[in-house]
A protein has these predicted regions:
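Acidic/His-rich, divalent-metal-binding segments that scaffold phosphate/diphosphate chemistry
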Residues: 1-88, 97, 103
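Histidine/acidic-rich helix-loop-helix segments that form or flank divalent-metal centers
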Residues: 20-21, 25-28, 50-65, 104-171
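Conserved small/polar residues in nucleotide/adenosyl-binding loops
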Residues: 173-175
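Amphipathic alpha-helical segments in well-structured domains
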Residues: 88-95, 109, 113
């Protein structure tokens, strides 16, 4: 992983989130440090997916998992913070622009942008909706649409939550 100064030089939009504090009870880290923590979590998962549960291990056993999309969506998931509007919407715009710098297929660029915009969806559904209500599941399925997107969103959500703090991860796995 690039040091923060290298990240800012490589991706100027990253400069806005360097040392940007998050004033809530969940985040232990500044936005840039949280992003780096999320990337570290993904690296840990790749080495030992079984340590993160059966679902994670199953997803990583599939050869079809597009790690390029996963790494870029984690790198960009909070890049819209520090702007006036919703960070997910702003992040999607920035990710769409930045993805043009990488050798990605159009479908990959769209997937990264979608994941950045919707990176909070799974945790929001899990924490704010009744998971025993069939309508909740149908609503979620309608937004996610396919297995690849579900897998990517699930891993992004795990990395995002574990990258917030150990306590956030522990409280979530006990839901």
């Amino acid at each position: 992983i690039l040091p923060k100064s290298g990240m800012k030089a490589f991706i100027p939009d990253f400069g806005r989130i360097v040392a940007l504090m998050q004033f809530n009870m969940y985040h232990w880290f500044t936005v840039d440090e949280h992003t780096i923590q999320c990337l570290k979590v993904l690296s840990e998962i790749e080495k030992l997916p079984k340590n993160y549960g059966t679902a994670v291990e199953e997803i990583f056993s599939r050869k079809s998992l597009n790690r390029k999309i996963l790494y870029l969506s984690i790198l960009f998931h909070d890049i819209g913070k520090g702007l006036e509007n919703d960070h997910s919407i702003e992040g999607e715009k920035i990710a769409t622009k930045l993805c043009k710098r990488f050798t990605l297929q159009d479908s990959e660029r769209k997937k990264v942008s979608w994941l950045v915009r919707n990176h909070l969806m799974m945790s929001d559904f899990a924490q704010k909706r009744d998971l025993s209500d069939q309508k909740t599941i149908i609503d979620f399925q309608g937004q996610v649409q396919d297995r690849e997107t579900l897998d990517l969103l699930f891993i992004l959500t795990v990395c995002d939550i574990k990258g917030v703090s150990s306590d956030a991860w522990l409280s979530l796995i006990h839901i």
